[in-house]
A protein has these predicted regions:
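Lumenal/extracellular ectodomains and adaptor appendage modules
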Residues: 1-236
Length: 236
């Protein structure tokens, strides 16, 4: 679409498609296959694409029970299930996330003498765009942030520890960038901005240690969802 139509025409086409899809949903809501609908909601929740917030406390508690609240850890509860947060946000004002591969690997947990548990985590971010594709990017897709090249996948990367935990021994290989330490309501995290041009990769490796209060609860990962699965499926 973006490669074949100018911006003005593509905007109109997308508006028409969205309107037709919405009319179809509302007009055929009585014919919906409930099983498929529930499956779609479950997949969206599992991938972190479906999140919700309710102003009413009772409703918000119900949302939390379903696991789609996407809230950061409770800073006052170090005994909660430990979660490693790996988040990134596009700062290039673009649609280049289609070319972003994000792979996070969590190593085997090592129990420490003080009751904490340490995990070695590796986050690999890659702009899989080829040089040929970079040379043909339409304006609607290319980066438009100040001082950014057209193929620049500029990302803010944030790595969160669980409540009562910490991050240490952090290294960056490949495309270099700085990660600064900070806290959010007492929860430690590292954050920085990386520029990935066509074909470039950065690999972040660090040790995440959970709290002693979390005991033997396994560490889980919460990561910003990407287009990776949809892109690979479309090209299969």
């Amino acid at each position: 679409m973006y490669w074949n139509y100018p911006v003005e025409e593509s905007d109109g086409i997308f508006a028409a498609v969205a309107s037709a899809a919405f009319d179809k949903i509302l007009g055929g809501i009585g014919d919906v296959d409930v099983t498929k609908l529930v499956g779609a909601f479950e997949r969206g929740a599992e991938e972190g694409r479906l999140i919700a917030w309710m102003r009413n406390d009772d409703e918000q508690n119900a949302i939390k029970e379903t696991g789609i609240d996407a809230s950061l850890p409770d800073p006052d509860d170090p005994s909660a299930d430990p979660v490693a947060g790996v988040y990134f946000n596009n700062l290039s004002f673009s649609k280049l996330d289609w070319y972003l591969n994000a792979d996070t690997q969590i190593g085997q947990g090592i129990k420490n003498g003080d009751g904490t548990c340490s995990y070695r985590i590796t986050v690999t971010l890659t702009n899989i765009m080829t040089q040929e594709e970079a040379g043909k990017l339409p304006d609607y897709v290319a980066a438009s942030a100040p001082d950014a090249a057209r193929d620049d996948e500029r990302l803010n990367v944030s790595l969160f520890a669980p409540t009562g935990g910490n991050i240490s021994d952090l290294t960056v290989e490949g495309t270099q960038f700085g990660l600064g330490a900070a806290t959010w309501h007492g929860i430690p995290f590292y954050s920085g901005t990386v520029d990935l041009h066509a074909g470039e990769t950065t690999t972040i490796t660090y040790t995440l240690t959970t709290s002693a209060e979390a005991g033997d609860k396994p560490l889980t990962l919460r990561q910003t969802p990407t287009c990776q699965a949809a892109r690979d499926s479309a090209s299969a």
